[in-house]
Amino acid sequence: VLEGLSALGKDDPELASVVLDAVRREGVTIREGAMVQRVSGTAGAIKVEIKTEAGSETIEGTHLLMAVGRKPNLEGLGLEKAGIDYEKSGIKVDAGLTTSNRKVYAIGDCIGGLQFTHVANYHAGIVIRRALFRIPAKVDTGVIPWVTYTEPEMAHVGLTEAAARDKYSKVNVLRWPMHENDRAQAQLTTEGLVKVVVDKRGRILGASIVGENAGELIQMWSLAISQKMKIKVMMNWISPYPTLSEVNKRVAYRQYATAASNTAVRKVIGWLAKLG
């Protein structure tokens, strides 16, 4: 039961649907956009009354797991005395992770935002560079990847297709299915796809992967986006065969397959062919 939310709502709907279909095939029923009205019962016999657009419903079960999220525990720290501003979601910081007290930094979950261990590690690296070496490092949330450890896994970095279309006038969306990969076929993990969004100049804006080892496969795209690489770079490396990582190279080639379908490009190719 998702109270007022949709399942995997922050992820690309195209990829999220792959995960949700797999979950449903295992017998899990998902109620989205629901409001919990009442919880009752005894140990081993629990009732949850919910309300959705379709009406009211009572769900019965033996156990109740509550995933209510978390928020920073800032009470009793004396932040006001230290001149450190904060709000309900966390301590306020600038792009350099400096608080309103310029001598104090804050990192990780206590500042809200993306609450991942690897984000806290990333923050720590920025603070060390700023505090010890006076390097003006700043947080770039656009290069932070995340992984949803479902089966199959889902991973993402950068802009989603929807976000990219909102920000840029023209984008190209590249896809490559896992079932075209020989390693995936050999180990019977063919479910999923790679999806990459590039701008009109070929700069990589975002990447999403759903499938076996998606969390490992996304790391190349995280590097590419952080270094502002273009999609052609992803074609110029050699991937060992047979590995799942070949999908990252194959999806990059879709950029030029798409270009070849353009009428003007086809005319140029035909003209060059006549020249021999």
Predicted feature residues:
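General small-molecule cofactor/ligand-binding pocket signal
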Residues: 29-31, 105, 172-174
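A short, glycine/Asx- and small/polar-enriched loop/turn
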Residues: 41-46, 101, 187-192
